[in-house]
Amino acid sequence: MQDQQQVIHKAQPWHGKVGLIYGQRQGKTEMQRCFTQAPFRIQRPFYPEGNRVCHTVLLHTAGGIVGGDRLSLDLELKPESHVFLTTAAANKIYRTNGETAQQDGIIHQAPGSILEYFPQEMIIFDGAEYHQSLRVNLAPGAVWCGWEVLRFGRTARGEKFISGNWRGLTEIWQDDELLWGDRQWLPGHPEVFAAWNGLNNQPVVGSLALVGLEISEAQMAELRQTMATIQQGLGGITQLPKGVLCRYRGPSSTEVKRWFISLWQNWRSLYSPQPPTLSRVWQTY
């Protein structure tokens, strides 16, 4: 395995890109433009919920991200389009080869558009150096819903994230107003991994946010009741000026995804008449 990982680290870095444009025509959301550059690929869109919601699966064919990789995602949703975007498998961030891996995303959503962005979990190897950023520009009436699930260290191997750095920045803007900003830095260190205000010896953290619409106190109370269903780990729910933010810290990526899916199923009706349908790549949840 050591030799295999050394080979991975010596490979040439990727400069991958994804560019997608969606539009709605006669009640059907269509992928109107698709540009990919290796290692990314896009599966053919499918419609398990009917024509209104376009399900899209993003593939990273290299199997993981290494130091020096530069990856970018550019999405545009035209008025009234509704897109459900996920990934085919968990992503891996390998131990650094001396360089930092970078992934950046920019999303533009027109009035009335809906994006549900639910990538599968990211596994950050001990010693990884990784930076990511995401900026979402929402027009009035647009809704963004997304999650991030991170596992720090290969837990099954007894590995902890005690060296390296993980940095992330997410910003959701509307009419030059920052609706939600989330800047995080988790340095790999034994004290940070163990500290109660760090990972508290829990390798999995997750964030789920719904941004772009008002959430009433009654709706917030209903959402908070779902925290009682968490069997492993801790959850928290915070009301945003135009949305809601949910956090998890615990031992199980399966547990956090089950909780996040239940929240999404609960609030889907707030912005779409379409009953939620689980993605076919989520069959194990």
From Swiss-Prot:
<comment type="similarity">
    <text>Belongs to the UreD family.</text>
</comment>
<keyword id="KW-0143">Chaperone</keyword>
<keyword id="KW-0996">Nickel insertion</keyword>
<dbReference type="GO" id="GO:0016151">
    <property type="term" value="F:nickel cation binding"/>
</dbReference>
<comment type="function">
    <text>Required for maturation of urease via the functional incorporation of the urease nickel metallocenter.</text>
</comment>
<comment type="subunit">
    <text>UreD, UreF and UreG form a complex that acts as a GTP-hydrolysis-dependent molecular chaperone, activating the urease apoprotein by helping to assemble the nickel containing metallocenter of UreC. The UreE protein probably delivers the nickel.</text>
</comment>
<dbReference type="InterPro" id="IPR002669">
    <property type="entry name" value="UreD"/>
</dbReference>
<protein>
    <recommendedName>
        <fullName>Urease accessory protein UreD</fullName>
    </recommendedName>
</protein>
<dbReference type="GO" id="GO:0005737">
    <property type="term" value="C:cytoplasm"/>
</dbReference>
<dbReference type="Pfam" id="PF01774">
    <property type="entry name" value="UreD"/>
</dbReference>
<keyword id="KW-0963">Cytoplasm</keyword>
